[in-house]
C-alpha cells in the first residue's frame, strides 16, 4: 500500500516504507484500543483508494470520500462528511478516520466531528500532531510552523503532493472535537493524536 501514493520524488520514496510500517502498527493497535472484531460494522471516513481495507481486507468496512474511488475494494459512498452523510444515526458500530481531519477546513471541523459521532456508536480518529517537527505530508522540517507565504515556497522542496491547504491540529483542538486524545510517540515527541471511543462504550 502506497502511503505517499499521491506524492512524488525522492522524499516520498524514502518515507513510504517507514510510513507504511507505522500505519501497520496503528492498524494492529486499532483492535486493541477499540475492541473491534471482524463482525464490527465500520465506516472509513475519508477512505482514499484503500484506507482501512488496504491492511484489513476482511473487515466489514464501508468507505466514504469526497471524490469517486473506482478501485475501492468494497462498498463505497461518495459524500462530504462535513455535511449530512446518507446514513441513519448509529448506522455503524465504529467510525474510522486516519489522517483526514487536518484536510478539513477549520471552520468545517466541528461539522465533520458531529457527523462522525452521529453515524457511529464509537470511533477511532487519528491525525498528525502539529507539535511534531516534521510535516508529514510535505516531509519537510518545520514546514507547518511557517506563515502561509514562506510555507508555500518551502513546500516546493518537499514531496510534491498538493498539501498546501493542510492545517495540523494541536491536542486541545483534537480533544474539543473527539474527546480525550492518546499520544503516538517517536521517542519523546508526539507524532500523532488518536481519539478512541471503544465499541460498546456507554452501553448497558
Question: Which sequence ranges carry the predicted segments?
Answer:
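Soluble or luminal CAZymes and related metallo-dependent hydrolases
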Residues: 18-28, 108, 166-173
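Short alpha-helix
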Residues: 160-180
Amino acid at each position: 500500500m502506497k502511503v505517499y501514493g499521491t506524492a512524488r520524488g525522492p522524499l516520498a520514496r524514502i518515507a513510504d516504507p517507514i510510513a507504511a510500517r507505522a500505519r501497520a502498527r496503528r492498524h494492529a493497535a486499532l483492535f486493541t484500543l477499540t475492541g473491534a472484531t471482524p463482525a464490527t460494522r465500520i465506516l472509513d471516513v475519508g477512505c482514499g483508494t484503500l484506507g482501512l481495507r488496504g491492511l484489513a481486507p476482511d473487515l466489514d468496512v464501508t468507505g466514504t470520500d469526497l471524490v469517486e474511488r473506482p478501485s475501492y475494494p468494497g462498498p463505497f459512498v461518495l459524500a462530504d462528511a462535513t455535511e449530512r452523510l446518507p446514513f441513519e444515526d448509529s448506522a455503524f458500530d465504529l467510525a474510522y478516520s486516519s489522517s483526514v481531519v487536518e484536510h478539513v477546513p477549520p471552520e468545517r471541523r466541528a461539522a465533520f466531528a458531529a457527523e462522525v459521532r452521529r453515524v457511529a456508536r464509537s470511533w477511532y480518529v487519528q491525525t498528525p500532531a502539529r507539535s511534531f517537527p516534521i510535516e508529514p505530508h510535505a516531509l519537510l522540517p518545520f514546514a507547518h510552523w511557517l506563515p502561509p507565504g514562506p510555507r508555500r515556497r518551502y513546500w516546493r522542496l518537499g514531496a510534491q503532493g498538493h498539501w498546501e491547504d493542510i492545517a495540523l491540529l494541536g491536542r486541545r483542538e483534537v480533544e474539543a472535537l473527539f474527546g480525550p486524545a492518546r499520544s503516538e510517540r517517536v521517542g519523546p515527541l508526539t507524532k500523532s493524536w488518536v481519539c478512541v471511543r471503544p465499541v460498546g462504550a456507554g452501553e448497558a
